[in-house]
A protein has these predicted regions:
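Long, helix-rich interaction regions
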Residues: 156, 161, 313, 400, ...
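Hydrophobic residues within the alpha-helices of tandem HEAT/HEAT-like
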Residues: 1-4, 22, 36-44, 62-63, ...
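HEAT/HEAT-like alpha-solenoid repeats
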Residues: 8-22, 48-63, 90-104, 131-147, ...
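Short inter-helical turns and helix N-cap capping residues of alpha-solenoid HEAT/ARM repeat scaffolds
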Residues: 25-26, 66-67, 108-109, 150-154, ...
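A generic tandem-repeat structural signature
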Residues: 10-11, 28-30, 36-44, 52
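Alpha-solenoid helical repeat scaffolds
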Residues: 3-10, 44-48, 70, 89-90, ...
Length: 485
């Protein structure tokens, strides 16, 4: 595993050692030998097939005679060897191995299931397997035996089946796979629905959605809406999957927006915090799509509802609402945004004291975007108030919060000019609290970076004349941060 392709010069010798293990009378030794070949083939891809020639025949014979776990290991070994072969040989071996794979689809053994899925992934990528063959011979059994509720409860198998479905879609096309996933999307079992949404999002992310006809689009959106409405777990995959499909459809989403937004607005007033959180998260993802569809009235309506929800008491939900508002600010014409920016910002300032990580990051990002896009709509006094709140966040134990606070501080300094901010920061260097002095020194460095060192240096050098150790140390720290930034 550590050597990877560096194993190639030693393959011949290793195969000489391993080949007798494939015909050993003890089952565990045959299994270990086959697993070793599978690992070596995987590591040496796409080279080294000549070294494996001596084990092909015993593997081939073993595949026809063995059953159970031994067969699973032999299948895994041959499955990893096929990608190393020339197209002609690969086609022949693929055709033969697929017969065994088809036969073993209904095996109850988990090891066999994993081996079958691995072989299917490898064979789908070879030229010998045609889309027609996969649609007619493989897909029906694959969906019948693997797309079942029990698979959704096994985390490892769940991921394998989802990934194999995405690989299969590259050969048979997105419409065929999505058509077969509509039933699991509507299933009563939530883990099964979640698994189906993960698969749909992988397929759409991989191949796009251009090939879907109008009827299939309607059925897909309907099924995703059902999955979203029925969700009771914390899995973010459902609304993210919905977002991937909506983003792929883009302007084709326009006919579906009204019912979707109606459901989101109902969910934002739901008694369950989890439902409200997921509704706000989906809202954040859909806002760029709403903008692309030209539904600006709908965007303003959403913005008003989100603004009215800022009194949310659950921090997880509040963080998602702030994220959605941030998305709305990015996608709107700020001169026409409702409610206006000068009404939104004073409402946000008290929320800066909330020390929940998700709230901190999202509120700072939202204020930073407003400071970058429309600073003139907010009074300088309000920006100064926000600057002092941000100073506290510069000493946050969370690195992501500190980084976002730094960027936002710089945006505000650019918006209102460095003079007022610098006066307040330089005064902070005289206080007794060390942490505040360090944060102020960092902030001075950020102001210098955002507005240019020439705006900050004269004031800093003037302040350095103050015969106070704290002030002088603070100025030196600020200079260090300025050079660092």
């Amino acid at each position: 595993l550590l050597l990877k392709r560096d194993i190639l010069p030693h393959l011949q010798g290793l195969m000489e050692c391993v080949k007798d293990g494939l015909t050993d009378e003890h089952t565990p030794i045959r299994t270990i030998a086959a697993n070793t070949i599978a690992t070596l083939a995987q590591m040496s891809y796409p080279y080294g097939i000549e070294s494996f020639n001596i084990v092909l025949e015993p593997l081939w014979r073993g595949m026809r005679t063995h059953r159970g776990k031994v067969l699973a290991s032999f299948l895994r070994a041959l499955g990893n060897l096929i990608p190393l072969m020339d197209a002609e040989y690969a086609g022949y071996y693929t055709e033969e191995i697929m017969r065994v794979v088809n036969r073993e689809f209904d095996s109850p053994d988990d090891e066999m299931k994993k081996a079958v899925l691995m072989v299917l992934q490898k064979c789908c990528k070879t030229e010998g397997v045609t889309p027609k063959y996969l649609r007619q011979e493989v897909a029906p059994n694959f969906f019948k035996y693997f797309w079942v509720r029990r698979t959704a409860l096994d985390r490892q198998l769940n991921k394998l089946v989802t990934y194999t479905t995405a690989i299969l879609s590259e050969k048979v096309g997105a419409p065929f796979i999505i058509e077969n996933l509509l039933t699991p999307l509507r299933d009563e079992a939530e883990p099964f629905r979640t698994m189906a949404v993960h698969a749909v999002s992988k397929v759409v992310a991989l191949l796009g959605i251009a090939d879907l006809d109008e009827r299939l689009e309607i059925r897909l959106i309907d099924a995703l809406l059902i999955a979203f409405q029925e969700q009771t777990n914390h899995d973010s995959g459902i609304f993210r999957g919905f977002g991937i499909v909506a983003t792929a459809l883009d302007k084709r989403m326009k006919p579906f927006l009204s019912p979707i937004i109606s459901i989101i607005l109902n969910h934002l007033k739901h008694k369950s915090p989890l439902v409200r959180e997921h509704a706000a998260d989906l809202c954040a993802i859909l806002i760029p799509v709403i903008k692309n569809c030209g539904e600006l009235e709908m965007l303003n309506k959403l913005s008003i509802i989100l603004y009215e929800s800022l009194g949310e008491v659950y921090p997880e939900v509040l963080g998602s609402i702030l994220s959605a508002m941030s998305s709305a600010v990015m996608c709107s014409n700020l001169s026409k945004l409702q409610p206006p920016i000068n009404q939104i910002v004073p409402t946000l300032t008290p929320i800066l004291r909330n020390r929940h990580r998700k709230v901190e990051i999202n509120i700072i990002e939202l204020i930073g975007r407003i400071a970058s896009l429309a600073p003139e709509y907010v009074a300088p006094k309000e920006w100064m108030r926000i600057c002092f709140e941000l100073l506290e966040l510069l000493k946050s134990p969370n690195k992501a919060t500190r980084r976002v606070a730094n960027e936002t501080f710089g945006s505000i300094a650019r918006a209102i000019g460095p003079q007022d901010v610098l006066v307040a920061l330089l005064n902070n260097l005289k206080v007794q609290e060390r942490q505040l002095r360090v944060c102020s020194a960092i902030a001075i460095g950020i102001v210098a970076k955002s507005c240019g060192p020439y705006t900050a240096l004269p004031a800093m050098m003037n302040e350095y004349k103050t015969p106070e150790t704290n002030v002088q140390n603070g100025i030196l720290k600020a200079l260090a941060f300025m050079f660092e930034y």
